Amino acid sequence: MRLRPLAALSVAAVSALLLAGCAGSGDTTATPEATATVAADLCSSAAPTGAASEGITVSGEVGSSPTVEITTPIDSTDLTLERTITVEGTGDALVAGDFVNYAITVVSGTTGEVLDQAGYEAGDLLPEQISPENGGQLFGCATVGSRLTIAGATSDETTPIVVYVIDVLGVTPTAAWGEPQAPVDGMPTVTLADDGTPSITIDTSATPPTETEVATLKKGDGYTVASGDTVLIQYRGARWSTGELFDGGDTWDGGSPYSAATTGFVAGFQKALAGQTGGSQGLVVITPADG
């Protein structure tokens, strides 16, 4: 696990940003120049539209489970992947690197049977980080609020054609968007850069707590995390004894948000995550017993 170095510490202070617990919410912005470049890169990877994807009728509100009708029989001959933007969203264009919140319905392209769906309720899905290589064929050139209809051939003889209806619900920021909370006396101090990167200041002369302590720095409005949920987080950790960051205790320095089940973390980190909401930022001081 990325957090195993905590086990070697006497006492550690960790600033953890919960971006999403199973699912997330919120908006993000980027500079126009950067957005134009990465959006163009993502657009170039988008699957083309075609007769198969255009011959599918999808009804219902974006963000709600759709009704899908295969109005024109789909010919799997030479079919690879086609995508039609069924509903054009009015939100920002997706760019490479975005963590996209989405809902998806999977339908048999031959029978019209719904095979699976998720994302229409909070906590169904984690955001997906997209790039030209990962998800670009599906999400390229789409905007928030769009509904995408995708048709593709499979190697499964029982379901040779699969249809996906994807609703683009939003983009999860990589920094907390929650409401600031009052600081807790005796805990380390956390200051934030403009991009949300935290700096941890510890009074190393003070006596550390004898039990793991948790404080909420920002309270988000997202899904409430339960034990065993998979979460998407940013974190930074420092040694109480020196105030210095420790190896392996950082996703901010050249890294990216990290996802795992809460039960995969050390006990102190599990205590910090349970009950938090998406968009929150917490501070936890972990004792050796919980590290």
Predicted regions and their residues:
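Cross-family detector of peptidyl-prolyl cis-trans isomerase
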Residues: R2-G291
